[in-house]
């Protein structure tokens, strides 16, 4: 099963619920916790990330991602320092739509990130053009968001019979 939980201060109570759940179940060490920084300015970024750590009930966050490129230069400096200090394990950057991928690729090309998160699905494949090959070449791990287009890909095949080869995969 999956052990990565990707959250954000933007997702309402998600960080608090995640922190409470992992603490109650005693599963923090089994989870890979990712969250995001999505604010302007160094001080606000530091405060937002500290609040995320408190809500997630962890002294060390596995991955903090600069969300949607917001003030990425400022936050990258802070995240590098945090990584050196051992309060985070990995640094990432995100953009949630196709139209942000050119800028995302330029940033990844000029800077070292451990992770990049972007949109990619069978009907949204722009990442194949530049971003995915660049991430591969730089050794940057890729997190895909919206792989099923918020369920629209499932709705498109609802009621359809599976092809015979699907049985090979226990579908």
Positions of PLM-derived features:
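Acidic (Asp/Glu)-rich catalytic clusters
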Residues: 18-30, 50-59, 79-84, 106-111, ...
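Active-site groove signature of glycoside hydrolases
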Residues: 53-74
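Conserved, mostly hydrophobic/aromatic
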Residues: 5, 18, 33, 52, ...
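N-terminal binding-site loop/beta-alpha segment at the start of enzyme catalytic domains
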Residues: 1-31
